[in-house]
Amino acid sequence: MNARDKRYDESLDAALLDPVEAAAYLEAVIEMDDPAALLLALRQVAKAHGMAEVARRADLGEKTLFKALSENGNPTIATVHKVLHAVGLRLSVTPA
């Protein structure tokens, strides 16, 4: 990873620690209607908070969390709910 990419990752991680920023980020990705992009965004939010800490707060094993949020992951709604709760967010539904 080059220095520019590292700075971007660090900047994104810092922004995603703010629940308002993280929620806006996830909402923007949801609007893309791309499940793979949503999985990546959820992984980025969890990474910003520290995967080990998110796993602990979500009462999930670290390997389970990494697998669920991996590129080929397919997390259950229960796992998504736990991860969101662990980072200070919640799932909600609004009219389309």
Predicted segments, located by residue:
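Residue-level detection of the helix-turn-helix DNA-binding "recognition helix"
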Residues: 70-71
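DNA major-groove recognition helix of helix-turn-helix/homeodomain DNA-binding modules
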Residues: 76-94
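Short glycine-/small-residue-rich flexible loop motifs, especially phosphate/cofactor-binding loops
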Residues: 43, 52, 81
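Short, flexible active-site-proximal loops enriched in glycine and acidic residues
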Residues: 55-56, 94-96
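N-terminal flexible/basic segments that precede or flank functional cores
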Residues: 1-44
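Short alpha-helical DNA-recognition segment
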Residues: 47-67
